[in-house]
Amino acid sequence: MIEFINIQNFKTLLNASFPLGNLNLFSGLNGMGKSTLVQSLLLLRQSYERNTLKTKGLLLNGDYVNIGTGKDALSSFSEQEEIIFTVKWREKEQPTRFEFDYQHDSDLLPLRKSGIDGDSESLSLFNSNFQYLCADRLGPQSHHQLSEFHIRDLKSLGHYGEFAVHFIAVNRAKDLEIDALRHPMAVSGTLLANIEAWMSDITPGLKINAVAQPQFNSASLSYSFNQGKETTEEFKPQNVGFGLSYVLPVVTSILSAAKGDLLIIENPESHLHPAGQSLMGKLCAIAANNGVQLIVESHSDHFLNGIRVAVKQKVVAADDVKVFFLQRDVHSSIHASEVMYPNIDDEGRIDCWPEGFFDQWDKELDRLL
């Protein structure tokens, strides 16, 4: 588990520190640097997978993220031509420091120093106990990609959730790794039963029909609904609410997680109604309380409030939840973001509310009164 990361001279972060917990929520106005922390971790992983991190350097473009070249990666107002990531893992006594030299037109920043050693495979950022779901996830589709390698060897749903349906089809009957994630209304402890139960809190009575079709090199998805003692006909995803298909990989990734896993999820609540957004906050909190580390980017006050309620109800300890708010002083001569650390107490209360931090409802309410 990652306990701490410091980022120097990368994009809008000149020198920013993030003490992480089990559940980490990144917020802020658009363009303030929320994604920069996520990108730093993805850069390390894609460089590790391409075997450049130990001996060559930081690969800026790859399977996880595409930054461009050195001029796109280096902070505009950096006084040093270097990018440094310092990561403290719970599994290691000392922080690991990654130093890279600047090259203006190269997409591989030369390695100056790397703390990667033989134990790196045990770290969730570098092994198969990792899941990343980007904001640009797939919407409703009847047919999805197959990949035995991704779902069995990597245990990956794909960055866009493109293998989620295949994953469900293959693992539908497997029991959850974390029993606390079992929904109280689930008919069993299996993955599919619990995906259906949690998502029925978003759309009542939902049934998921995921079938692998290797003869067509695809996996099919359709939905049906409980209607009294009967079940409706199957419906194409295109004819059911957009949010269901968009959130399906998110729910699947959380319910299939095990203790020690690292999940990075962008906008897990998008396209859901407010109650569904709050539910996603609760689901993340349950996973975090059982040893899963989640790094989440969100603009949703409902998602935040779902986490706050979970803290108050003792679903997750307040100390295991970290909130980061990124902002930038438009009057400053330096184009760089600063990080603020609103704290959630045991009652779910937040100790500070910076301007722009989930405060739009209060502003609109003031105008209405």
Q: Where does each model-flagged region fall?
A:
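Phosphate-coordinating catalytic segments in nucleotide- and nucleic-acid-processing enzymes
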Residues: 47-249, 253, 258, 340-369
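Switch/communication elements of ASCE P-loop NTPase nucleotide-binding domains
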Residues: 1-56, 61, 70, 217-369
